[in-house]
């Protein structure tokens, strides 16, 4: 075993045609071409540790070609582990790579796969940079992330290995719940342990039943709880359902997108428009149950039919969507 400071390189290798200088030969005052030559290792295991002796990374390579100062190296056929606090946080493989700045940065390129064994998230890209001291893996080309709860693509992905948060930027697309829900935006944060997807920039949500779109919404912000299959929309939003044909406007909407519990709930004023029958109903709070095809509204409710110019006021309204019938109770007034 041979260690090459400062990279703390454990060599399990067969030296190629180029051999290291005779250790008994002292360097001359002049810059010797022999001493300045590159070191090439084959079938080597390389590792780096922090000041406390904890591993930062450990990789096996087909070949490693070092610069004369031994602070940089070009790598081929890489497979290994990336660490944080002495524990493996990513298992990686790639076709090419580089050790930079005395091991403070690892660049991987071409056919990269990175698996987090703690949560089973798999990250794919054509170029990533690992900064062990920061615990951040940045993917810059053709990024894709896969997990049992979610599949994402983006121009760039930045993975914080400590909290296990994935930050996505540029043409982001996220498919959840076996492609029942698709979210698109320019930026998202995926908190993997919390089963949470956060969009702080304008985004679009589309719900599918098979290949057919059932619901869609454009919103300035959203929080998607992947485990519970619900979306919280905190700002004024306009929700459009194609099955049934409803348009719902409200603030602070909670949307349950599971097939068996598909519904909307809000404790703020809302307006519901049946855009085929031209019926509008409003209330101070309400619930739309798509699975049961029913709507409940309470608090200063009213229903307006544009076709027959009629209006109904009540404390409580229940609307049966398929046959367009209304049940009213409390302070009823019909015009």
Placement of each model-derived feature along the sequence:
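Mature-chain termini and adjacent capping regions
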Residues: 1-335
